[in-house]
Amino acid sequence: MVRCRTLVAAALALLLTPALAWYKPAAGSHHYSVGRAAGLLSSFHRFPSTRRSESPALRVGTVPLRNLEMRPSVRSLALCVKDVTPNLQSCQRQLNSRGTFQCKADVFLSLHKAECQSA
């Protein structure tokens, strides 16, 4: 019964068309988004002046990426999203929203500059 519900929820999620973009690139960014999940990683490419304010979730239990000490060689790495493969069996409905699901996904990244430019 649970598996049937999961399959029905996944089928409905695939049939519905997205209404709006789920992220917006930073204004004046010098980096281009690659792949469907590039918006999730766009903070790696932004300059401190163009970053959005911290969300309350970050303040509670995690350390924001910009406060971490990173070597210059790590900061200058090219990072691009090569592919995103969602795991529909891991999807769970969010309690505070009627049509929102949280799913796990495999995200394939590349740190090689040549691969990022060819994508």
UniProtKB/Swiss-Prot annotation:
Disulfide bonds: none annotated. GO terms for cellular component: anaphase-promoting complex; extracellular region; nucleolus; nucleoplasm. InterPro entries: Neuropept_B_pre, Neuropept_BW_pre. Residues 1-21 form the signal peptide. Detected in a variety of tissues. High levels are found in the lymphoid organs, central nervous system, mammary gland and uterus. It is found in: Secreted. Its main location: secreted. The keyword Ubl conjugation does not apply. One of its GO terms (biological process) is protein branched polyubiquitination. GO terms for molecular function: cullin family protein binding; G protein-coupled receptor binding; ubiquitin-ubiquitin ligase activity. Keywords: Cleavage on pair of basic residues, Neuropeptide, Secreted, Signal. Belongs to the neuropeptide B/W family. May be involved in the regulation of feeding, neuroendocrine system, memory and learning. May be involved in the afferent pain pathway. This is Neuropeptide B.
